[in-house]
Amino acid sequence: MKEFYLTVEQIGDSIFERYIDSNGRERTREVEYKPSLFAHCPESQATKYFDIYGKPCTRKLFANMRDASQWIKRMEDIGLEALGMDDFKLAYLSDTYNYEIKYDHTKIRVANFDIEVTSPDGFPEPSQAKHPIDAITHYDSIDDRFYVFDLLNSPYGNVEEWSIEIAAKLQEQGGDEVPSEIIDKIIYMPFDNEKELLMEYLNFWQQKTPVILTGWNVESFDIPYVYNRIKNIFGESTAKRLSPHRKTRVKVIENMYGSREIITLFGISVLDYIDLYKKFSFTNQPSYSLDYISEFELNVGKLKYDGPISKLRESNHQRYISYNIIDVYRVLQIDAKRQFINLSLDMGYYAKIQIQSVFSPIKTWDAIIFNSLKEQNKVIPQGRSHPVQPYPGAFVKEPIPNRYKYVMSFDLTSLYPSIIRQVNISPETIAGTFKVAPLHDYINAVAERPSDVYSCSPNGMMYYKDRDGVVPTEITKVFNQRKEHKGYMLAAQRNGEIIKEALHNPNLSVDEPLDVDYRFDFSDEIKEKIKKLSAKSLNEMLFRAQRTEVAGMTAQINRKLLINSLYGALGNVWFRYYDLRNATAITTFGQMALQWIERKVNEYLNEVCGTEGEAFVLYGDTDSIYVSADKIIDKVGESKFRDTNHWVDFLDKFARERMEPAIDRGFREMCEYMNNKQHLMFMDREAIAGPPLGSKGIGGFWTGKKRYALNVWDMEGTRYAEPKLKIMGLETQKSSTPKAVQKALKECIRRMLQEGEESLQEYFKEFEKEFRQLNYISIASVSSANNIAKYDVGGFPGPKCPFHIRGILTYNRAIKGNIDAPQVVEGEKVYVLPLREGNPFGDKCIAWPSGTEITDLIKDDVLHWMDYTVLLEKTFIKPLEGFTSAAKLDYEKKASLFDMFDF
C-alpha cells in the first residue's frame, strides 16, 4: 500500500507528521521542510512557472519555513506579490503525497470519549476543572473496545464496583439494558483514587493515541476539562502528554454567549460530533443535547436516571457508569447511520488538508485549487484581505396564497456551479465589462446582445471563452463526484421502494438477504428473487438500502455544499480568489435564468393549452420553478384517468417528452444570447404532486414565499408506494414548534392535501381534546436563550423583554439558590410554557433548559398553572389558520341556518 498521512503540524521550523507507512504501520516523523514560493519575473526570463493570469514566475527554494515567512513579509513591505502556498502544512502534504491518496480507514484510530464529573456546586467549569473526574469511557475504533475508567473513592463518596452482569439485565430485572452487542466489548477498570485513574488513562492514551478525537461537545467540555484537571494535579508538562508531539495551544474564544476555552492537542484532529452534526445534517433542531438528537436519529435516547446528575454517582453508581458508556455508544450509533466521520475523511484526503479543516470551505478549496494548479506548474496568487461589501442574492417569486391541485416542479442542476462553468467565471478569465441594461430587459430578451466575442453575465461582466478558468475546472471535478453519489442515492431509494412493495406479500420461507450492491438499480433477475424472500430478509435488505441511501445522500449533499461554498468563497474577503464582480455575476445570472425560463414555460404552456396570458409558473425560488398542471389535466379530462398512478404517469411523460425539451430550448437561446462558453443550464422535472384521484384533497397550497406544502407521488423518477408530503417553511419544520404540535400540524396538512376539509375538521376536534392530556414537554415551545443579561433588571424583565426571556428570568428566580436545578446557559435552547394569571411565580410564562425535565422543585406548580388555552392558540391554532386561510378551507365546521333542520 502507498503511504498516507494521519495528522500534520507545523511546530517551529519543523513539520511533525503522523502517517501510515507502506507496511500499514503507524509512524511519526519530524521533517525540516524546505518550502518553495514564487515571485514574478521578466517575460524574457526562461521559466516553466506562470501565475493564473499567464505572467511568468520564478521559483524560490528556502532553507526553512522561517526564512520563507520572512521573505513574504519583506515582499509585502516593498509592495511586491509573494506567490505560492503560504500554509506550509498544505505545501508539505502536496509535496509528500503528489498522488491521489487511497486511505485505509481501518488504520485510522478514531477515539470517541465522554467523561463524568460530580459537581456539588453547579455545572463543572472546564477552565477551572476543580472537581474530580470520576468516570471516563473511551471507545477505540481499531480495538473495537469500550475502555471504562471508574473512580471508586472520591471526596463526594465511595462506591462499589460497577457490575457488567447487572448492566446487561433488563431494567425490569434491576439492570441497565446496556445493549448486548457491546457488553463483550467493555473493558472495565476501577481505581481507588483519581491520581491513579488519570495517570493510567494518560498511559493508555499514549499507547493508543487517537488520530481523530470525537464525542458529543468534547471540544467545549471533555477535552479542556481533562487537560486542565491533569494540569491541576500533575502540572502542565504532564498535561501536554495528551499531545503526541508534546505541544498544545490554549485559546479563549469570546462570543455573544460568553467565553470558552479551546485546547488544541497538536497531532490529533478533533472532530466534535455536535459540530459535525450541525454542519452536515441539514436539520434545525430545537435542542442539540445528545439525548434529543439520539431520540431524533435513533428513536432511543440516553439512559434514564432518577434525580439530578450531581447525585447519581452517590445514589446509583451502577447506573452512573452505564449512563457514561451509553453516551459514547449513542454517538457511535449516530455516526453509523450518518457517516460524518467517513465523510470528513473523504473530504480531507481529497483536498489534502488537516482533517479538522473540513469545517472551513475556504481552507478546503484553497488546498484543492492549489494542488490542481501545481500539477500544471501554475502558481497561486498571494492571499489578501479586502473590505466587506454586499452583493445580490437569489430570486424568489412572490406566490399568490392559494390551493393548487396539480403541481409539477422543475429544478436546475447545481445552479451556481453550473453558472460558473457556463459563463467561465474565474479571476483570470475576466475580459472586461459592457454597458448594462435593466435586468428585466435581459429576461425578456429585448436588450442588445452584450457581446459577440466574450461570455457575459447580465451584471456587465465579460469573460474569455478561449481558455478554461481555474474555478470552473475545479468545480467540474467535484460536480461529477456529486452526480455519481446522487446516482447511488436515487438508485438505493428506488431499490428500497421495490423492497417495500415485496413486503406487502412476503414469502414464509427461511432464507438469507441477497448479497447485492444497493448503489445500482436492481436487475430484473434480482427483482424476481426479491419477490420470493421472507419478511425478515426483506427487512434486512430494506435496512441496508436505506443506509446506502443515507450514505449517498450525505455524500452528494455535502459535495453540493462544497460546490456551492466555492461560489460563496468567491465573495468572501478572506478567500485567495476573492472577487466581488464574480460573485455578483453568478447571482445576477441566476436571477435572470429563473425568470427567463418562467417566461419561456408560460409561453409554451399557453400554446399547448390554447390559453392566453395564463401564469402557469406559480412560484420560483433560486433554482426551481413550480408549475400549475390543472389546465394540462383539464385538457385531457380528469375522468379519462383510471387511478392516481395513471395521471402521475401522464404528467411524468408530459414533463419528460414535452416540457423538458421546451425548457432546454429556452435555456439554449439564453446561452446564445449571453454568448456563453457552453450550455449547462439543465432543468429536470423534480416533483409531481396532487390529491388521490377522486378524493376531496386539495393537492397543495402556498401561504407565501418559501412556505408551501405538496402531496408528492413521484420525485425525480422515484415513484412512491404511498405519497410523501413536501413541506417547506411551515411551522411543522420549525424547531420552535412543540414536538407534538409539529406532528399534529403535519397530520392536518396531510388531511388537507389528501382527504379534504371534512377530514381536517374531524382531526381538529380530536387534537383539541387530546392536547390537555399530552406530556408537557411535547407541547412546550422552544426558543434560544440569547441576550438574557440585556433584559435582566434585578432578576425581573426589563422594557421590551421577549416572552421566552421573561420565562427564563421567572425560572431563575424560582430555582435561586438550588445548585441541583439545571441552569439556563446563554445561547442554548429553552422550553417555554405560558402560565395562567394568579400563579405563584408572579409572571405569565416560565422557561427552562430544553432536552430536560423541569426540576422537581417547581414541577408540580408549573403543571398546575400552565395555560393550555394560550398554548394551543399560539402553537397550533394560529399556524393552522394560516394554512387553511390560504387554502380556502375551514378547520372548524361553521354553523349555518341549515343546521337547525333535519334535512
UniProtKB/Swiss-Prot annotation:
Name of a matching Pfam family: DNA_pol_B
Question: Which keywords label this protein?
Answer: DNA replication, DNA-binding, DNA-directed DNA polymerase, Exonuclease, Hydrolase, Magnesium, Metal-binding, Multifunctional enzyme, Nuclease, Nucleotidyltransferase, Transferase, Viral DNA replication
List ligand-binding residues for Mg(2+) 2.
Answer: D222, D327
Give the start-end ranges of region 3'-5'exonuclease.
103-340
**What outcome is documented for mutating S565G in this protein?**
Increased incorporation efficiency of correct dNMPs
Question: Mutating D621A has which effect?
Answer: Drastic decrease in the efficiency of incorporation of dGMP
What's the reported outcome of changing L415M? No effect on base selectivity
Q: Which residues bind Mg(2+) 1?
A: D114, E116, D327
Q: Which residues bind Mg(2+) 3?
A: D411, D623
Region span, Polymerase: 380-903
Q: Which Gene3D superfamilies match?
A: 1.20.1280.300, DNA Polymerase, chain B, domain 1 (3.30.342.10), DnaQ-like 3'-5' exonuclease (3.40.1820.10), Helix hairpin bin (1.10.287.690), Palm domain of DNA polymerase (3.90.1600.10), Ribonuclease H-like superfamily/Ribonuclease H (3.30.420.10)
Question: Site: Essential for viral replication. Where?
Answer: D714
For region Interaction with the polymerase clamp, the annotated ranges are 897-903
Q: Where does substrate bind?
A: S414, L415, Y416, R482, K560
Q: Which reaction does it catalyse?
A: DNA(n) + a 2'-deoxyribonucleoside 5'-triphosphate = DNA(n+1) + diphosphate
Listed result of changing D327A: Complete loss of 3'-5' exonuclease activity
Phenotypic consequence of K706A: Almost complete loss of polymerase activity
Site: Optimization of metal coordination by the polymerase active site. Where? Answer: D621, K706
Note the InterPro entries from the entry. Answer: DNA-dir_DNA_pol_B, DNA-dir_DNA_pol_B_CS, DNA-dir_DNA_pol_B_exonuc, DNA-dir_DNA_pol_B_multi_dom, DNA/RNA_pol_sf, DNA_pol_palm_dom_sf, DNA_pol_type-B, DPOL_T4
**What cystine pairs are annotated?**
none
According to the UniProt entry, its GO molecular function terms are: 3'-5' exonuclease activity; DNA binding; DNA-directed DNA polymerase activity; metal ion binding; nucleotide binding
* Family to which this protein belongs: Belongs to the DNA polymerase type-B family.
Provide the protein name.
DNA-directed DNA polymerase
> Which species does the entry assign this protein to?
Escherichia phage RB69 (Bacteriophage RB69)
